[in-house]
A protein has these predicted regions:
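C-terminal motif of bacterial Sec signal peptides marking the signal peptidase cleavage site
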Residues: 15-19
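Bacterial N-terminal signal peptides that target proteins for export
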Residues: 1-8
Length: 190
């Protein structure tokens, strides 16, 4: 009789736990998701460039003066300071804060399209400095029409400027490749 009572008790407890669905009333804890960001500055440009169809690709080059890459983005050697300041318009005072860089440029006219992606410690300060530098630049041999600055997780900042025919497809590919990227600046260059 004791065995039957014990079995009935186990059966009743099992059914009651099943009815409660085994849930407990513990408070939910939520954490903000972290944005990991890209693995490298070069990865950002390679991912965006890969979205171009052959019909949309322009005659491009990447890298820097010493290590150019034909027809694709390339990593920038940070020791080539004149390329960083002259071609990518990074103010010399900001160079120490850049720990990684990659570039993609129109091979015939850099003012038609130039893009750099940089790893920096202070994204907001660097973006503000770059906006001021590009907007205040004295242009020769063609004038870029649009400036775009975007940030990614991990301290990566993209700065691109050029004519609208080059910038519009680039911006579309940027937003397709990195929908979580924060567009900090998207404005005409006056």
């Amino acid at each position: 009789m004791k065995k039957i009572t014990a079995l009935l008790l186990v059966l009743v407890m099992t059914l009651s736990l099943a009815a409660c669905n085994g849930t407990t009333n513990t408070p939910e804890t939520t954490t903000e998701p972290t944005v990991a960001g890209p693995a490298s500055a070069l990865e950002v440009l390679e991912t965006i460039w890969a979205l171009y169809t052959d019909d949309n690709k322009f005659f491009a080059m990447g890298g820097d003066y010493e290590t150019p890459v034909d027809g694709a983005p390339g990593a920038v050697n940070l020791a080539v300071k004149d390329f960083l300041t002259y071609s990518l318009l990074i103010p010399e005072a900001e160079l120490a804060g850049v720990t990684e860089a990659a570039s993609l440029m129109h091979a015939m006219n850099a003012n038609s399209f130039t893009c750099g992606v940089y790893k920096v410690a202070d994204v907001a300060a660097f973006a503000g400095t770059m906006e001021t530098a590009v907007m205040g630049n004295q242009w020769m041999c063609g004038f870029p029409e649009t400036l775009v600055i975007a940030s990614f997780g991990g301290g990566y900042v993209l700065v691109a400027f050029g004519v609208n025919d080059a910038m519009n497809p680039f911006l579309t590919n940027l937003q397709t490749a990195y929908p979580a990227a924060e567009l900090l600046v998207n404005k005409p260059i006056a």
